[in-house]
C-alpha cells in the first residue's frame, strides 16, 4: 500500500500538488483562510472574557472553590464566552498551530495509514470517517483526499464531533461544497450536514454517542489535551484535590484566582485509585478522558474499526502540565479566563489502560510522532513535494516537515496510539501495524 501510494513516476501516483502552508519563520503573517464570521465573532469573544471571569468569581463565592476540571470546562466551552465557541483560535493569527496546519504531509500520511489498515481488515464498506474535535477541518480535508483516491468502490460518510458552532462552520467551509445548519427542533443526531465536492456526505454531532453505529475510522488529533483534568496531591497518605478559589473576597472588581488544596475529601479524590506502580505524589487525572476512551473502546469492539489518537503527552510520569497558551506563548491559566487556550498533557498510560479494560481492544503504541512519520515514508513524500514545488516554496515545505519530526520540536513530544478490535490481536502480531513497528 505504501509503495503504491508513494510511487514516483510519470503518472505521479498520489502526488497532489504542494499546498502553501504557513512559513513559521517568516516575519509576515500568512493568510490562513479565516472564516467570514471571524471579525464579529472575535469582537464578541473579547467582550466575553470579563463577564466569564465575573461568572466564575460569583460561582466560587457562592458555592466555594471549584475543581480545575470545572474551571477548564467552563473556560473552554462556555456557550457565550468559551475559548473555542466564538472565534478562530488556530494558526499564526491564533494562539497555537497544529501539525496539519504546518504541513500537508501530516494529513496525507495519516490518510495513507488509515487506508492501509482498512485494506488489511478486508476493506469493509460502507464505513465512516469520524474525527473528534476537528479544529479548522484541515486534517479531515487532507484525509478526505486520500480516502477519495484509494477507497476503490467503497462508500463512506464523514462524521465530525464538534461542540463549537463557530468551528463547525469553519470546518464545513474547509471541505464541503455545500452545507446547512439544521433547525434546533429537527430532532436528529446531527445539527449540521454538508456534501463534499466528490459527493461524500458529512454530518456534525455534539457527542460521540450521537455518531451512528457502524465500522468507523476514528481520528482524535489534539482532542484529549483539551479535556478537563482534576489535579490531585498525596498528603499524609491520602489523595486531596487541588481547587481554584478567588484570590480575595473583598468584592474587588478585578476577578483574580488562585490554587488551594481541598480541606477535605472531594468526590474525585475519595474515589480515585492510582494505576499499579504509581509513584507520583501529585498528578492530573481526567475523568472525561476515561469516559471518551471507554466509548471508543466499546464502539470498536461492537462495530469494528480503528481509532488513531495523536496528541502531546506522556506515559504516566509527568505531574504538573496544566497550562495556557495565548498568541503562541505560555500564559497564566488563571488570568483572563476565556482569552487563552487551556491544556494538559495526555496520559497515554491511562488511555491504554482504559481502552484495554473497558473493551476487547488491542492497542499499539504510543510511538513518537517523528518516528511514525518517518516509518510512513515521510521523507519520500517530502522529496516528491520539493521536486514539484516552486523555488520560493521549497524552504517552507522543508521546514514544515522538519518541525513535525525534529526531536527538539514536535518529533518526540507528540505521540500516536492506535486502537483495533481485540479479535485482530493475533493477526496484527503476524502482520505488524505500519508506523508502530
UniProtKB/Swiss-Prot annotation:
Top EC group: transferase
The residues that cross the membrane are none
Q: Which Gene3D superfamilies match?
A: 3.40.50.12710
Keyword Hydrolase appears in the UniProt entry? no
Tell me its EC number(s), please: 2.1.1.320
Query: Which Pfam families does this entry report, sorted A to Z?
Result: Methyltransf_28 (PF02636)
Q: Does the keyword Cell inner membrane apply?
A: no
Give the principal location in a single coarse category: mitochondrion
Which GO molecular function entries does the Swiss-Prot or TrEMBL record give? protein-arginine omega-N symmetric methyltransferase activity
User: Looking at the record, which segments are called Disordered?
Assistant: 21-49
- Keyword annotations from UniProtKB, A to Z: Methyltransferase, Mitochondrion, Transferase
Record's subcellular location: Mitochondrion
Q: Which InterPro entries match?
A: NDUFAF7, NDUFAF7_sf, SAM-dependent_MTases_sf
Q: Which GO terms describe its cellular component?
A: mitochondrion
Gene Ontology biological process terms, A to Z:
methylation; mitochondrial respiratory chain complex I assembly
Provide the catalytic activity annotation: L-arginyl-[protein] + 2 S-adenosyl-L-methionine = N(omega),N(omega)'-dimethyl-L-arginyl-[protein] + 2 S-adenosyl-L-homocysteine + 2 H(+)
Q: What does this protein do?
A: Arginine methyltransferase involved in the assembly or stability of mitochondrial NADH:ubiquinone oxidoreductase complex (complex I).
Family assignment?
Answer: Belongs to the NDUFAF7 family.
Q: What name does the UniProt record give this protein?
A: Protein arginine methyltransferase NDUFAF7 homolog, mitochondrial
Tell me which species this is from: Drosophila melanogaster (Fruit fly)
Q: Highest lineage ranks of the organism?
A: Eukaryota, Metazoa, Ecdysozoa, Arthropoda, Hexapoda
